[in-house]
UniProtKB/Swiss-Prot annotation:
PANTHER family: HISTIDINOL-PHOSPHATE AMINOTRANSFERASE, HISTIDINOL-PHOSPHATE AMINOTRANSFERASE 2. It comes from Methylobacterium nodulans (strain LMG 21967 / CNCM I-2342 / ORS 2060). Disulfide bonds: none annotated. It comes from the Bacteria. GO terms for biological process: L-histidine biosynthetic process. The keyword Transferase applies. It catalyses: L-histidinol phosphate + 2-oxoglutarate = 3-(imidazol-4-yl)-2-oxopropyl phosphate + L-glutamate. Belongs to the class-II pyridoxal-phosphate-dependent aminotransferase family. Histidinol-phosphate aminotransferase subfamily. Pathway: Amino-acid biosynthesis; L-histidine biosynthesis; L-histidine from 5-phospho-alpha-D-ribose 1-diphosphate: step 7/9. Homodimer. This is Histidinol-phosphate aminotransferase. The gene is hisC.
Amino acid sequence: MSAALRPVPRPGVLEIEAYVPGKSAAPAGVKLHKLSSNETPLGPSLAAIAAMRETGAHLELYPDGSATDLRRAIAGKYGLDPERIVCGAGSDELLSLLTYAYLGPGDEGVYSQYGFLVYRIAILAAGGTPVVAPERDHTADVDAILKAVTPRTRIVYLANPNNPTGTYLPFDEVRRLHAGLPGNVLLVLDAAYAEYVRRNDYAAGLELVAESENVVMTRTFSKVYGLAALRIGWMVAPAAVVDAVNRIRGPFNLSTAAIAAGTAAIADDAHIAAAVAHNDAWLPKVTRALTDLGLQVTPSVGNFVLIHFPDAPGRSAADADAFLTARGLILRRVGAYGLPNALRMTIGSAEANEAVIAALGDFMREQDDA
């Protein structure tokens, strides 16, 4: 067959840079502390593990394609109508489905400068054009986002809190953003880290979804619930948006194990409280300790911190990453986000956090002595 006749992806597909997950390997013989993917150090709820195991005797059966039990559990937790909830294989799938449903060739999707990489991937996969709004102090800027909106804009994506910076917008600013958008533009509030936020002026956005026809909120079970391996996400949206997404959603996009584990996890309030309390204790400790070493740390409300390094030989983020990796401490390079001189560190176990602080202290001292 002639090479000229081989199948060719449609325009734009090969412009997509595939998402690269955080590293998960250390050198042989070195204890691994994986702090690259914002996973909870407490692991999943024991109730979730038990519920998942109970599904193992009936693997020949298809799962409930509507994830009814999980939607009802989520609705009960947050006081929502289960008919306004869609579950997906992680919030990533839901972000993609929303994009495919509402954005196509010639359309634009707007997101902030250091927003989640999946937005760009989804927009390009749908044949649309990504539009990036500049941030201010590593924080989304409502005025810049509104300025980026054009008649071709179909979706505005806002990660709140944002990954990888850990910054957030107060709810008044989110409302101002929504008020400035045309009614035909969908505002997608990506609240993957909402459970960790301890700020009185923050809200994930449920109120705005309830009172609007063009607002969606997505959430995940991959972070505070510790179920990243099972890929469980959910969104709450206006009925018309739910209908559109369900028309293109795969009929069995969540496994029976995922549905069972998620249903049990969301009911385990004690486990969630313990995970949040661990973060409450360690986030300020890690931030203060790294700052005391002379490193700049972006103030974070999530379960991670963004650490900035000098753009200098021997002191760069790449140098620090190599130094840490050799000691089994795996952080996240964020050059793909336009932050080549930074590393993102998950708030891990006490042992892992202390190991990173000690290792970065050694790294900084070695450079001072060089």
